[in-house]
């Protein structure tokens, strides 16, 4: 359901027209030491589940975020980010990397690599020394192969300290916690890709 580091104990709802799943955006390995101050723990976006037939992986469980009901229409991105809560849609073909960064040089990276894998990299995304496990390299970067050939679209929803990345019609999802020292204000795209951004309604 999710290839990221921080999605745990997902539950679905009974009596709804759609099969909706919500998870706990955390990881038991370091959940007790998160540098969030006034709160501890948050939930993922609700996701509508479905089966999608993929050319490279056969039938796959997909989760489409219901954020379309929360966010407005996307507008082109010109290099700067509008705040700490937004949805970013990136479309491209082949290899590309998207970087969200701040003035301190901290950056969260995601994209499609040269082997065709979708990946996220929070190795230099901000505070990581609050827990020895969180700081380990194995909790920095993760990737997963695509289930589709050709052009791709990635949707990333960012909400202050949690971001959720969806690709290949929701058959790939990555949930991860990030703790930038100050908000990300810049976006940079390398490769054949373009982006649009949507704000919460």
Residue ranges and their predicted role:
Residues 1-201:
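Beta-rich accessory regions
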């Amino acid at each position: 359901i999710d290839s990221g580091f921080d999605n745990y104990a997902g539950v679905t709802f009974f009596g709804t027209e759609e099969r909706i799943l919500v998870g706990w955006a955390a990881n038991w390995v370091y959940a007790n030491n998160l540098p969030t101050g006034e709160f501890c723990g948050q939930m993922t976006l609700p996701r509508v589940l479905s089966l999608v037939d993929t050319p490279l992986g056969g039938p796959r469980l997909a989760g489409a975020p219901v954020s379309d009901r929360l966010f407005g229409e996307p507008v082109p991105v010109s290099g700067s980010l509008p705040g700490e809560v937004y949805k970013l849609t990136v479309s491209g073909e082949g290899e590309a990397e998207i970087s969200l960064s701040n003035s301190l040089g901290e950056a969260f990276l995601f994209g499609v690599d040269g082997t065709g894998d979708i990946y996220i990299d929070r190795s230099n995304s901000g505070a990581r020394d609050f827990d020895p496990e969180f700081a380990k390299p194995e909790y920095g970067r993760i990737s997963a192969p695509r289930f589709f050939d050709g052009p791709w679209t990635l949707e990333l929803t960012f909400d202050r300290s949690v971001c959720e990345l969806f690709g290949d019609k929701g058959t790939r999802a990555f949930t991860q916690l990030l703790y930038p020292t100050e908000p990300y204000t810049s976006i940079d795209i390398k490769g054949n890709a373009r982006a649009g951004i949507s704000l919460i309604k």
